[in-house]
Amino acid sequence: YTQNSDRQVQSIAYSTDNGRSFTKYENNPVLTSDARDFRDPKVFWHKETQRWIMLLAVGQEMQIFSSSNLKDWAFESSFGEGQGAHGGVWECPDLFELPVDGTNEKKWVLLCNLNPGGPFGGSATQYFVGTFNGKEFVNESPSKTKWMDWGKDHYATVTWSDAPDNRRIAIAWMSNWQYANDVPTSQYRSPNQAAQYGDN
């Protein structure tokens, strides 16, 4: 998790009771930087290299780190220069593999949330499709900016796996930093539940 004190650093909290409670690791932080924006870790196990991968948002790029034990991290590469939209800070990264419909092929998808700089102003989620070898993500179409949703109410998208039918499930804010603090609710912000149907 990102520990926010005088600067943003990455720390560990672990559970020994199936997630009912968490203990902060005594040797936190496990990863530091001099960068002003250094946050939103996405950590996953990369089977091919037998290492943990951490993707972090750092200014207007994503940085990739690897570890064998979740405590000692090595910088592998950065992604972002000359890629996608750069109208604001890059946040909430995600990186995962998906099957390509109608083929036996799989491709990697990197999500990048941007604020401001969306196609209609304010916040938005862009994505990149390509390859990942455990160290470096390579975008297959670097001259294109791809948006996950063209509406104004889609930001901070994150995904998780391990659904019973092997789906990758995504969830996002149904809001925008242009007006997130001005919605007419007090116990929650924007809708509690929304669904999108159809093939689009």
Predicted regions and their residues:
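Repeated scaffold domains used in trafficking and secretory/extracellular systems
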Residues: 91-93, 155-157
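Beta-rich carbohydrate-recognition and catalytic domains
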Residues: 1-40, 45-91, 99-150, 165, ...
